[in-house]
């Protein structure tokens, strides 16, 4: 059996678990979505890249990207339809820098297996143009290409910002 090629991941979501809002019942089942599967969905649907472009960004073949995207969509659909929790962790991935840091200079890269590998958010590609908005006070500033909004602190209150 051929070894799996580690995928290039340029973003890692700060949240690791999503659960249905259901105060009356306990969530008994959980779906595991790998970090590289989440990256496939992000590149395809949020950055609106073609499968060929997204596969190139992840440094994998287009057919491998297509399988990862299909698997991710099946998992998320199953969780939404059947009220299951989604846990994000693991997968075979690496972050862009070769000095064991992620795209924003945070956390280890390299190993790429399991929780805690490849920490870091944002990245060199920067995504489409737009604004960063403060989660606390609502202050907006233009997005700087190549700098993740999550790495920008609000000029007014110092809170982290998110992409609008």
Swiss-Prot record:
InterPro entries reported in the protein's UniProt record: RNA_pol_sigma_r3/r4-like (IPR013324), UPF0251 (IPR002852)
Stretches the record annotates as Disordered: 91-123
Biased composition (Gly residues): 104-115
Biased segments, Basic and acidic residues type: 91-100
One Pfam family named in its UniProt record: DUF134
Family: Belongs to the UPF0251 family.
HAMAP family to which the protein is assigned, alphabetical: UPF0251
Protein name as annotated: UPF0251 protein MM_1448
């Amino acid at each position: 059996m051929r070894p799996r090629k580690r995928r290039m991941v340029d973003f890692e979501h700060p949240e690791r678990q999503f659960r249905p809002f259901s105060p009356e019942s306990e969530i008994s089942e959980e779906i595991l979505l790998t970090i590289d599967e989440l990256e496939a969905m992000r590149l395809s649907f949020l950055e609106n890249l073609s499968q060929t472009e997204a596969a190139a960004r992840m440094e994998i073949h287009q057919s491998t990207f297509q399988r990862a995207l299909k698997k991710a969509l099946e998992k998320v659909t199953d969780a939404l339809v059947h009220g299951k929790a989604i846990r994000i962790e693991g997968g075979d991935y690496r972050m862009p820098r070769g000095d064991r840091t992620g795209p924003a200079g945070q956390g280890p890269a390299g190993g790429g297996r399991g929780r805690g590998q490849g920490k870091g958010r944002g990245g060199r590609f920067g995504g489409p143009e737009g604004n960063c908005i403060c989660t606390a006070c609502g202050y907006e500033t233009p997005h700087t290409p190549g700098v993740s909004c999550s790495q920008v602190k609000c000029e007014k209150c110092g809170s982290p910002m998110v992409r609008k």
